């Protein structure tokens, strides 16, 4: 069974025991989180589609760790002006392990 969940402005296709990196969640490592914004749940012809979410469907996950992504450099240069600016950014991520998918 699989599900499509929405978190952090993105959609992820998940299955039981899947490990996935998502946008940062405010939860401690080892804590359990629940995703209630489930868009699709099921398998094959038995899949249920939400409008926009499937009622009563919950995806449970365990927080494995928090980390940061690769550094992205934002560089701006104005030609012939002796002007340049460089700025780096590292996005915060949370690694979760899907433990259970509960259909309505």
UniProtKB/Swiss-Prot annotation:
Keyword Transcription: no
Pfam families, per the entry: Ribosomal_L21p
Sorted UniProt keywords: Ribonucleoprotein, Ribosomal protein, RNA-binding, rRNA-binding
Gene Ontology cellular-component annotations: cytoplasm; ribonucleoprotein complex; ribosome
GO annotation (BP), single: translation
SUPFAM superfamilies for the chain: L21p-like
Molecular-function GO terms, alphabetical: rRNA binding; structural constituent of ribosome
Role this protein plays: This protein binds to 23S rRNA in the presence of protein L20.
Subunit structure: Part of the 50S ribosomal subunit. Contacts protein L20.
NCBIfam families reported for this sequence: L21 (TIGR00061)
Family under the similarity heading: Belongs to the bacterial ribosomal protein bL21 family.
Protein name: Large ribosomal subunit protein bL21
Gene name per UniProt: rplU
């Amino acid at each position: 069974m699989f599900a499509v969940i929405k978190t952090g402005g993105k959609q992820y296709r998940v299955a039981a025991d899947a490990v996935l990196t998502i946008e940062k969640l405010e939860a401690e490592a080892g804590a359990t989180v629940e995703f209630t914004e489930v868009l699709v749940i099921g398998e094959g012809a038995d899949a249920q589609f939400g409008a926009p979410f499937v009622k009563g469907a919950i995806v449970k996950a365990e927080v494995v760790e928090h980390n940061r992504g690769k550094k992205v450099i934002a560089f701006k240069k104005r030609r012939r002006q002796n002007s340049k600016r460089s700025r780096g950014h590292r996005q915060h991520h949370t690694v979760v392990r899907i433990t259970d998918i509960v259909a309505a």
